[in-house]
Structure formats: C-alpha cells, structure tokens
Regions:
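C-terminal regulatory/interaction regions
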Residues: 80-144
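Metallo-beta-lactamase
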Residues: 1-79
Length: 144
C-alpha cells in the first residue's frame, strides 16, 4: 500500500468479482490459511475508503472496504454452514457441494479441496469442530 498515492497493489488478496483461493497446501498440511487470510482482511479494512485497488485479476477498482466486508461475511457464512453440516462427521470432500454450488471439473475439484480443508482447519483450530481419522485414514470433522 502506498499512502502517498492511495494505491494498494492487492495481488490475489482482494479481487473485484471472485473470492481468493485460500487453500491448505501439501507442504503445510496442518496450516490454517483461512485464519491468516481473515487477519489480513482485517488490516485491509483499515485502509482509507478511497483507496484504489490494483488486483491481479480484473480491473482496478475503488470500494476496498465494501469488498473486504463482503469477503469476510462470505467466509463467516460458509463457516457457519460447515459447522451445521458437521453435525454428522464429514470429510473435506463431503462438504464440497456446500462450499461450491456448481459442478466442478477435475482441476477445479483439486483446488476446491484445498479451500474446503482451509475452512475445516479454521473451525478445528477455533475449537468449533473436532477431527479424527476414520478406518480408511480420512480426516473426518464433526461439531464439538
């Protein structure tokens, strides 16, 4: 962020039309990237209202605070939906239809799995879900 110019080079952090891919990666299988993302959004929310945002995808835009508010609410809503869905044990694959309400191709499914895990990890580390490995070795998450 350049205060003198009122410009934020946002990269993928804040995109104008789609949500950022926040995923658990194979190199950090126990990471909590959604927490890091939400913490970063909180910082972005403090920037001036007239900030010009330069995203890595899409056109430059104004309205950073509104976009950050939307993104935070979007993820909070998804987290609440996941807690309710995990009244019975679920794997990350089980919750894909809840998080992604359209048919996903193979590539999109791989990306979506990382995002599903990021949401499950946030709830697990926040104490709202517990997890265990089932007899096939798959992590199952259930409401605490």
């Amino acid at each position: 962020y350049c205060a003198d110019l009122g410009v934020l080079i946002a990269g993928d952090m804040v995109l104008p039309r789609i949500t950022t891919n926040v995923s658990v990666q194979a190199v950090e299988p126990d990471a909590n990237p959604l927490r890091w993302f939400m913490d970063s959004l909180a910082v972005h929310a403090t920037l001036p209202a007239d900030t010009l945002v330069l995203p890595s995808h899409g056109l430059p835009f104004h309205g950073l605070r509104e976009r950050v508010r939307y993104l935070r609410n979007h993820h909070k809503q998804r987290l609440e939906e996941l807690v309710q869905a995990c009244a019975t044990p679920k794997s990350a694959a089980d919750v894909l239809p809840l998080l992604f309400r359209r048919k996903l191709d193979e590539r999109e499914t791989r990306i979506a799995m990382g995002e599903a895990l990021a949401h499950m990890h946030e709830l697990y580390y926040d104490g709202r879900l517990r997890r265990y490995r089932d007899e096939q070795g798959v992590w199952r998450y259930t409401k605490t």
